[in-house]
Amino acid sequence: MTTEAELSERLSEVEDPIIGEDIVSLGLVRDIQIDGDTATMSLAINSPFAPAEMEIGEQIRETVAEEGLEADLHANVDNIRGFDDEVFPNIRNVIAVASGKGGVGKTTVAANLAAGIDELGARVGLLDADIHGPNVPRILPIDEEPGVMAEQERMVPGVSDGVKIISMDFLTQNQDDPTIMRGPMVNNVMTNFLENVEWGTLDYLVVDLPPGTGDASLDLLQTLPVAGAVIVTTPQQMAVDDARKGLRLFEKHDTPVLGIVENMSTFHCSSCGETHDPFGSGGGEKIAEDYGVENLGALPIHEDYGADGTTDPVVKNEGSDVNDSAVELVESIADRIGEVNRRKAAGILDNTDSGTAFGEQPSGQAKLETKEPDGH
């Protein structure tokens, strides 16, 4: 009969597909116990349905099965986040989406990221923190309107095809009216969004930050247990310069930058058949190279990104010509979050990832799924 030590030795043959070292040496496999035909173990992973972590899980199950055992896997990531306050205690990963300036498609990226991770099978929320330009409900169709839990005086998010959403747009009577607020009022709204929303348990919360590096973004970074940030730019030099400022903001707050997304990268002309670079080229790639962060991908200019809140976002529109690039971007970001978490657990954070402020895992141990669940 296989012993725990022998099974651990076998599992050392399983390699983390991104970090490139075996999962036992990394310390990702913990508390192996064999009882009859079942091998139960804890894994220091925290990015549900990220492709790389799904692959790790499948390789573990195959290895355990070769020993005549059935694997019972649980996520145990008590030391991954390490953030002491109680903001979002039931949310595993907070992903900030930011830009150095407005008009680069930050909200489009945030909305498609949330919808795409939901499509992978995870439980996802989307916080529209851009108080003065709350456009998320105009991109994602709302199936269930937001509400209020009267007894607890807590807001209930709206829902778009499984994604829970909170936005200032829900609180305005006329969508054409500007949000006229000074700093203290904005802070009050954000405090309510952070403390008085019934998110439930989420695997990921995507936060659409305000553009720029002002007080609103600073306050959020000082309050939220952000696992990592995505910076959106266009190839245009002005946008690239401002994106650099945004990147430095996250560095100063010891928040891992998951990578750069270059939006409006190219335009394919259906008339002439040529692909053009209307805003130049290589801006996102250059920032990534200069700062040693990931170049997560480039999204083209395409009419399907002009969602008006009545149709599916590109990432869920399999008939779209640009669906593949959107899905690849989502998977890259999910994998990057997983990599940061596993490096944290293994104690091998590099300079890009060091000093991260993480919070406690909401459920301690969570049973790992083998396939996408039927519901969220």
Residue ranges of each PLM-predicted region?
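Residue-level signature of catalytic and energy-coupling elements of molecular machines
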Residues: L11, V29, I91, G102, ...
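Phosphate-binding loop that captures ATP/GTP phosphates
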Residues: G121-Q173, N187-N188, L194
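C-terminal lobe/tail of nucleotide-utilizing enzymes
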Residues: E4, L26, I45, G57-E58, ...
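Extreme N-terminal, non-catalytic leader segments
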Residues: S25-A98, P373
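Walker A/P-loop phosphate-binding motif and the immediately C-terminal alpha-helix
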Residues: V94-I131, L140, E151, L247, ...
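Switch II (G3) loop of P-loop NTPases
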Residues: G147-A150, M168-D219
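Inter-motif core of Ras-like GTPase G domains
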Residues: M190, E195-E198, S217-M238, A243
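N-proximal, solvent-exposed amphipathic alpha-helical segments enriched in charged/polar residues
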Residues: M1-R30, I34, A71
